[in-house]
Amino acid sequence: MSPLVTRTALALLAGCACAAHAADWSDTSLSYRYGTKFAEPFNDKDITKNIVNLSSVSGYKYGKNFFSVDFLMSSEVDPSSAGAKSGAHEAYALYRHTLDLGKVTGGSWAFGPVRGVGATAGFDFNSKTDAGYNSKKRMIVAGPTLMLDVPGFLDVSLFALWESNAPYNTFTGAATPRYAYKTHPMLTAAWGIPFNIGIPLSFEGFANFIGTKGKNEFGGDTARETNIDMQIMYDLSAAVGAGKNTFKVGIEYQFWKNKFGNSDANNPGATAKTPMVRAEYHF
């Protein structure tokens, strides 16, 4: 790992530790989603997944933090090992810290539709137990963020990604030493926009547009990646006598092309088109 990435990681951890003791507001949620049309590269079968998520977002004097961890449980067509009758299991964690430059400097950074500008850093970390790859992804991200002036929030960021992996294939017993991909860009947006058509709804989600990352660990080319995940959520809290935004249910759709940088040319599992149902509890 380069000195720049190391310094970024240390600064990130320091910011996280400070912010954790000074949160002005926070929202933690536990959610469940389910779909039967998930896909994985080099697997031509539709995969059913049950996904449990724990997320937390908080704000403090100079910015905000976001942490999320998915626990993904696949059906047996995405097996946990070669010849297994059980499905794969995966944990995927993500953290982002955004430093609001206007709050730091005491001046306005607003222009046009932009209400503020931030500097964001964070990490992705995953571990999956499956038959063919057993991903152990490690990734540092950093870059500028534009915070748009909309109801709710809409943040647009341009990140540099420092990503590595160390896969293991249970079919061959081959372990690949940790491999660092070429530093590559990601244009990303995240949003949560409330609206009302007689019932309280919100449009939420994220979109990632990721550049190629050089050769993969096996010497093959990587492809540009698109991952759009969006949902319409209904706030049913009032109907059950709870506070606003405590209980939400909705429908979700994910379009993920060239998953993990694997081209979908002659590889149908590399692109997923997945409808889901989703339920959330906020506390």
Describe every region a protein language model picked out:
Residues 22-72:
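Short glycine/proline- and aromatic-enriched beta-strand/turn motifs that initiate or cap beta-hairpins
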Residues 54-58, 95-101, 142-148, 160, ...:
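Residues on the lipid-exposed face of transmembrane beta-strands in outer-membrane beta-barrel proteins
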Residues 223, 232-283:
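Predominantly the C-terminal beta-signal and adjacent terminal strand-loop region
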